[in-house]
Amino acid sequence: MASRRVVSSLLRSASRLRAASPAAPRPRAPPHRPSPAGYLFNRAAAYASSAAAQAAPATPPPATGKTGGGKITDEFTGAGAIGQVCQVIGAVVDVRFDEGLPPILTALEVLDNNIRLVLEVAQHLGENMVRTIAMDGTEGLVRGQRVLNTGSPITVPVGRATLGRIINVIGEPIDEKGDIKTNHFLPIHREAPAFVEQATEQQILVTGIKVVDLLAPYQRGGKIGLFGGAGVGKTVLIMELINNVAKAHGGFSVFAGVGERTREGNDLYREMIESGVIKLDDKQSESKCALVYGQMNEPPGARARVGLTGLTVAEHFRDAEGQDVLLFIDNIFRFTQANSEVSALLGRIPSAVGYQPTLATDLGGLQERITTTKKGSITSVQAIYVPADDLTDPAPATTFAHLDATTVLSRQISELGIYPAVDPLDSTSRMLSPHVLGEDHYNTARGVQKVLQNYKNLQDIIAILGMDELSEDDKLTVARARKIQRFLSQPFHVAEVFTGAPGKYVELKESVKSFQGVLDGKYDDLPEQSFYMVGGIEEVIAKAEKIAKESAS
């Protein structure tokens, strides 16, 4: 009983003490400190959600009924707006507009200038400033000068009025033959044809050049690349192709000179006049070729866009007139080089080997427009300069992916005095198939390549041991290979003024028959020098007889 009273009194005293004293604070949990990455992620997520909540429209915008997909369309705005030049750094010009920025790729024209200076919008800087690339020299340009928004991309004249004429990147004639009188104009920035509009057909374009037609034939409506270093004959080969195709097929050609020598452009123009490809004065409408020049003395903006100008002229002949057009680009590497300069001027960080990060995109935008549609075709032959003869350089390597045939010009072959200096083993074509060419042509081409490859394999043995150590079969292989090597040479029409030898156009059937005869050993008794710089096999026989008479006398 006494113990129970003691316990109850202790409980009562404890309760009084608890009521009188303040509540003891609970022990705090250690503060949660998120990691820096988690903190930044949480802040970014909160900001994005709040920004999205503020920017979300109450109702969806009305449909416009046009499906541009954010690509190049005709919906350019702000035509007639006036801006002011606020900064000039070489070929880069910054222009301020008080209201409404012109879209990317819009053409602007500088007012009150001594020449027509076109600027193309490349970047938007802030809310009222654009950075542009000049299509001509910016000498004499001053801050505050007025600039007009044309409301469209660079637009150039197209159609038959351009035949026999030379125009620049913005469509101005530069041949001193007056204005180009036409009602047809097109923007140089256009979408590639849709898949449903494209057509694929396997047909050879006969060039009349033996080594090309036999070993790496060109596809009508395809893309062909001429690879080679400096001075191995790319431009001469292109000039011969223009000459042969104009005479043999009668089709229209467009030549785009991109960043090459002005002297060569002038020589090409004179050659075309002399050969009748271009006619002057009253007969100009009978011309077969249009020339578009943006040579190496032009600013990078002009060189980066002149290829598109030439392509636009060719597209009109294909789409509006249903023509099979030949588009020659000399040199597609200069197109890449100019875009690299523009990229550096715009402050983009360079990619591999100093090229622009958008190398594949720039090239693809041009190449995808060169195609065959159900209306007509564009067959493109592109000279491709190979820096330091390195085919793994990003510029030529990226171009390879777009090509249907490659014609590789070799310095080793040119050093032997064999022109055109086409490498018969490195040059390739998707057309080299028995289903396309037929069994005779295919077997002859492969037979020629096999003999040349065997000769190449034997050259080390010959250099070390000499010809006497070879077997009889190997000696025969070497003799035939040397004849084939020389027989692949050919005098060109456009080189007559330099060599004095008349040019030769060799039909495809004759080429196949002649080389098959060499492989079969029909001409083993003829000296190898009789195969050098001739056309068909009849000329070889005639030259051999002439050599025999000279040696006998």
From Swiss-Prot:
<comment type="similarity">
    <text>Belongs to the ATPase alpha/beta chains family.</text>
</comment>
<comment type="subunit">
    <text>F-type ATPases have 2 components, CF(1) - the catalytic core - and CF(0) - the membrane proton channel. CF(1) has five subunits: alpha(3), beta(3), gamma(1), delta(1), epsilon(1). CF(0) has three main subunits: a, b and c.</text>
</comment>
<dbReference type="GO" id="GO:0005524">
    <property type="term" value="F:ATP binding"/>
</dbReference>
<dbReference type="Pfam" id="PF02874">
    <property type="entry name" value="ATP-synt_ab_N"/>
</dbReference>
<dbReference type="GO" id="GO:0045259">
    <property type="term" value="C:proton-transporting ATP synthase complex"/>
</dbReference>
<dbReference type="InterPro" id="IPR050053">
    <property type="entry name" value="ATPase_alpha/beta_chains"/>
</dbReference>
<dbReference type="Pfam" id="PF00006">
    <property type="entry name" value="ATP-synt_ab"/>
</dbReference>
<dbReference type="InterPro" id="IPR005722">
    <property type="entry name" value="ATP_synth_F1_bsu"/>
</dbReference>
<dbReference type="InterPro" id="IPR036121">
    <property type="entry name" value="ATPase_F1/V1/A1_a/bsu_N_sf"/>
</dbReference>
<feature type="region of interest" description="Disordered">
    <location>
        <begin position="52"/>
        <end position="71"/>
    </location>
</feature>
<dbReference type="Pfam" id="PF11421">
    <property type="entry name" value="Synthase_beta"/>
</dbReference>
<keyword id="KW-1278">Translocase</keyword>
<dbReference type="InterPro" id="IPR000194">
    <property type="entry name" value="ATPase_F1/V1/A1_a/bsu_nucl-bd"/>
</dbReference>
<dbReference type="Pfam" id="PF22919">
    <property type="entry name" value="ATP-synt_VA_C"/>
</dbReference>
<dbReference type="InterPro" id="IPR042079">
    <property type="entry name" value="ATP_synt_F1_beta_sf"/>
</dbReference>
<keyword id="KW-0067">ATP-binding</keyword>
<dbReference type="InterPro" id="IPR024034">
    <property type="entry name" value="ATPase_F1/V1_b/a_C"/>
</dbReference>
<protein>
    <recommendedName>
        <fullName>ATP synthase subunit beta, mitochondrial</fullName>
        <ecNumber>7.1.2.2</ecNumber>
    </recommendedName>
</protein>
<keyword id="KW-0375">Hydrogen ion transport</keyword>
<keyword id="KW-0406">Ion transport</keyword>
<keyword id="KW-0472">Membrane</keyword>
<dbReference type="InterPro" id="IPR027417">
    <property type="entry name" value="P-loop_NTPase"/>
</dbReference>
<dbReference type="GO" id="GO:0042776">
    <property type="term" value="P:proton motive force-driven mitochondrial ATP synthesis"/>
</dbReference>
<dbReference type="InterPro" id="IPR020971">
    <property type="entry name" value="ATP_synth_F1_beta_su"/>
</dbReference>
<keyword id="KW-0066">ATP synthesis</keyword>
<dbReference type="InterPro" id="IPR020003">
    <property type="entry name" value="ATPase_a/bsu_AS"/>
</dbReference>
<feature type="transit peptide" description="Mitochondrion">
    <location>
        <begin position="1"/>
        <end position="47"/>
    </location>
</feature>
<feature type="compositionally biased region" description="Pro residues">
    <location>
        <begin position="24"/>
        <end position="34"/>
    </location>
</feature>
<comment type="function">
    <text>Mitochondrial membrane ATP synthase (F(1)F(0) ATP synthase or Complex V) produces ATP from ADP in the presence of a proton gradient across the membrane which is generated by electron transport complexes of the respiratory chain. F-type ATPases consist of two structural domains, F(1) - containing the extramembraneous catalytic core, and F(0) - containing the membrane proton channel, linked together by a central stalk and a peripheral stalk. During catalysis, ATP synthesis in the catalytic domain of F(1) is coupled via a rotary mechanism of the central stalk subunits to proton translocation.</text>
</comment>
<feature type="region of interest" description="Disordered">
    <location>
        <begin position="16"/>
        <end position="36"/>
    </location>
</feature>
<keyword id="KW-0813">Transport</keyword>
<keyword id="KW-0139">CF(1)</keyword>
<keyword id="KW-0999">Mitochondrion inner membrane</keyword>
<keyword id="KW-0547">Nucleotide-binding</keyword>
<dbReference type="InterPro" id="IPR004100">
    <property type="entry name" value="ATPase_F1/V1/A1_a/bsu_N"/>
</dbReference>
<keyword id="KW-0496">Mitochondrion</keyword>
<dbReference type="InterPro" id="IPR003593">
    <property type="entry name" value="AAA+_ATPase"/>
</dbReference>
<dbReference type="GO" id="GO:0016887">
    <property type="term" value="F:ATP hydrolysis activity"/>
</dbReference>
<dbReference type="GO" id="GO:0046933">
    <property type="term" value="F:proton-transporting ATP synthase activity, rotational mechanism"/>
</dbReference>
<keyword id="KW-0809">Transit peptide</keyword>
<dbReference type="InterPro" id="IPR055190">
    <property type="entry name" value="ATP-synt_VA_C"/>
</dbReference>
<dbReference type="GO" id="GO:0005743">
    <property type="term" value="C:mitochondrial inner membrane"/>
</dbReference>
